[in-house]
């Protein structure tokens, strides 16, 4: 009687609950998410949808700040509110309804407006990892953005008006360790094998049962001897075809590992070099000049640079990851073990250099752990740093804005709508009411004047077309929940990228037109 198959380890309740998202950003990403707290400024449909996209995956906590009460018009704009909350605190209603989605998340609320908090409780925003805001007038937006820039707290500002929506990310510096590139190349180090790999490759007989890596190594050696100029790896289409033919000539029928080796010729070489993006990080002043306030990312980056230049002949640490290969289990596991051991050895050298730097800076040794170093070594080729701009810079003269103007008129393109929404916010500040809420024709004229002055102040010799401004007034400040749901979902995704330090966030503005289903990302 055969023995029963071993059981898979039991998943915890949390792992079962968040299984799909953990597949995207891992247990370590989930841990960062559950440790984060965010603030939602203003209860709007787009704000609630953004918060929903964070509460469902298990954000650590959220606080809602809004000084208004629920009115009849809110019920039509925001599906999160119902008639039972009429006349009650909008912040409380939002907090309670969001918490129902995930009782594991801590919720809080403050019955105060952003203006009041900035004027009377300026330290209110200090403790948050990120702030999400919507439906602010220009003056309040700029005050909030400047305060958060000083605190180095990221801000996601969302707009949803009629069929239009935008997201603006303000972040001082964002260091990305796990960028999750679409086309990741496996670093196999065939052209520069380390000692343990060379011994294994040279000492193993090539049969139909071994991984294709051994097949490719064997016939790469044959091909190298045929090169009069001493070329070590195929550099172009012709040379790659020569190597493929060398393998094909020795292949017997139905040898899958030989077929895989032939296919791998195109992608098996060239990894392990320092890409331009990483060179820029190595040459950055933040990497060159460490101090006690340096982000641990920069300390690890400098240790990584030292390893590459002084200890690894210009090559990156080995990630230690192999692609799937047709082979018997023992031979594949043996090869996998060699790569993993070398990856651990490389990471250990980088870790010890990190500890040296921490000691020099008089920082605690536990500021950087081995797991973090192993991760940055594994992902070294994809490291990225984004340095954002202040929202206030958009309201100052900037050459960055000039290329957005075509033929001296901002027509019905997405850039025009972005400027029109900014004119809408200035209208709120100067006039104290929503354009189009009461006397539409009168408000259109005022909005035109505000838009013209705004563009003139920016040094832009352009106008926003009447059709665009008419459309803004026609919306009368109304949110369409379907548009808000889309913008909120996108914004929540950006928040998660920032908190988990995975995937590249927008840099820095996303604009969406639901009428034409067009979208664009701009750096403003």
UniProtKB/Swiss-Prot annotation:
<comment type="subunit">
    <text>Heterodimer of Uba3 and APP-BP1. The complex binds Nedd8 and UbcE2M. Interacts with Appl (via the intracellular domain, ICD).</text>
</comment>
<dbReference type="InterPro" id="IPR045886">
    <property type="entry name" value="ThiF/MoeB/HesA"/>
</dbReference>
<dbReference type="GO" id="GO:0019781">
    <property type="term" value="F:NEDD8 activating enzyme activity"/>
</dbReference>
<dbReference type="InterPro" id="IPR000594">
    <property type="entry name" value="ThiF_NAD_FAD-bd"/>
</dbReference>
<dbReference type="GO" id="GO:0046982">
    <property type="term" value="F:protein heterodimerization activity"/>
</dbReference>
<keyword id="KW-0833">Ubl conjugation pathway</keyword>
<comment type="function">
    <text>Regulatory subunit of the dimeric Uba3-APP-BP1 E1 enzyme. E1 activates Nedd8 by first adenylating its C-terminal glycine residue with ATP, thereafter linking this residue to the side chain of the catalytic cysteine, yielding a Nedd8-Uba3 thioester and free AMP. E1 finally transfers Nedd8 to the catalytic cysteine of UbcE2M. Required for Cul1 and Cul3 neddylation. Appl and APP-BP1 interact antagonistically during development.</text>
</comment>
<dbReference type="GO" id="GO:0001540">
    <property type="term" value="F:amyloid-beta binding"/>
</dbReference>
<dbReference type="InterPro" id="IPR035985">
    <property type="entry name" value="Ubiquitin-activating_enz"/>
</dbReference>
<dbReference type="InterPro" id="IPR030667">
    <property type="entry name" value="APP-BP1"/>
</dbReference>
<dbReference type="Pfam" id="PF00899">
    <property type="entry name" value="ThiF"/>
</dbReference>
<dbReference type="GO" id="GO:0120500">
    <property type="term" value="C:NAE1-UBA3 complex"/>
</dbReference>
<dbReference type="GO" id="GO:0045116">
    <property type="term" value="P:protein neddylation"/>
</dbReference>
<comment type="similarity">
    <text>Belongs to the ubiquitin-activating E1 family. ULA1 subfamily.</text>
</comment>
<protein>
    <recommendedName>
        <fullName>Nedd8-activating enzyme E1 regulatory subunit</fullName>
    </recommendedName>
</protein>
<comment type="pathway">
    <text>Protein modification; protein neddylation.</text>
</comment>
């Amino acid at each position: 009687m055969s023995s029963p198959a071993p059981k898979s380890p039991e998943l915890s309740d949390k792992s079962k609950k968040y299984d799909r998202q953990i597949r995207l950003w891992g247990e370590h990403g989930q841990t960062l998410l559950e440790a984060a707290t965010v603030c939602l400024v203003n209860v709007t449909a787009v704000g609630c949808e953004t918060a929903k996209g964070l509460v469902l995956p298990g954000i650590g906590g959220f606080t809602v700040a809004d000084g208004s009460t629920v009115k009849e018009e809110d019920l039509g704009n925001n599906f999160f509110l119902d008639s039972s909350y009429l006349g009650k605190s909008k912040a409380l209603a939002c907090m309670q309804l969001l918490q129902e989605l995930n009782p594991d998340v801590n919720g809080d609320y403050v019955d105060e407006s952003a203006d009041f908090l900035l004027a009377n409780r300026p330290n209110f925003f200090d403790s948050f990892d990120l702030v999400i805001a919507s439906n602010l007038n220009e003056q309040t937006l700029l005050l909030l953005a400047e305060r958060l820039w000083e605190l180095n707290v990221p801000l996601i500002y969302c707009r949803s008006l009629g069929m239009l929506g935008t997201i603006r990310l303000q972040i001082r510096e964002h260091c990305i360790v796990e960028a999750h590139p679409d086309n990741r190349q496996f670093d196999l180090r065939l052209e520069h094998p380390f000692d343990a790999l060379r011994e294994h490759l040279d000492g193993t007989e090539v049969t139909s049962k071994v991984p294709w890596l051994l097949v490719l190594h064997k016939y790469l050696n044959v091909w190298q001897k045929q090169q009069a100029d001493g070329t070590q790896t195929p550099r172009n289409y012709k040379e790659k075809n020569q190597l493929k033919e060398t393998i094909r000539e020795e292949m017997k029928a139905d040898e899958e590992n030989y077929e895989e080796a032939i296919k791998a010729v195109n992608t098996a070489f060239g990894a392990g070099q320092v890409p331009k993006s990483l060179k820029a990080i190595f040459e950055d002043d933040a990497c060159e000049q460490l101090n006690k306030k340096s982000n641990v990312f920069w300390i690890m980056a400098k240790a990584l640079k030292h390893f590459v230049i002084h200890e690894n002949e210009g090559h990156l640490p080995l990630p230690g990851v192999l692609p799937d290969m047709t082979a018997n289990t023992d031979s594949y596991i043996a090869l996998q073990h060699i790569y993993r051991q070398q990856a651990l050895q490389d990471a250990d050298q980088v870790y010890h250099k990190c500890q040296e730097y921490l000691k020099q800076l008089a920082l605690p040794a536990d500021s950087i752990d081995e797991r973090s170093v192993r991760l940055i070594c594994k992902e070294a080729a994809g490291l990225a740093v984004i340095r954002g701009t202040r929202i206030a810079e958009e309201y100052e003269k900037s050459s960055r804005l000039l290329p957005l103007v075509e033929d001296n008129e901002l027509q019905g393109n997405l850039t025009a709508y972005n400027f029109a929404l900014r004119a809408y916010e200035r209208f709120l500040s100067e006039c104290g009411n929503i354009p189009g809420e009461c006397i539409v024709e009168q408000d259109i004229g005022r909005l035109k004047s505000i838009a013209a002055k705004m563009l003139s102040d920016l040094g832009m010799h352009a106008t926003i077309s009447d059709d665009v401004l008419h459309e803004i007034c026609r919306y009368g400040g109304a949110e369409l929940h379907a548009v808000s749901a889309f913008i909120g979902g996108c914004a929540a995704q950006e928040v998660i990228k920032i908190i988990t330090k995975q995937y590249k966030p927008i840099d820095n503005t996303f604009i969406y037109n639901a009428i034409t289903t067009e979208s664009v990302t701009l750096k403003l």
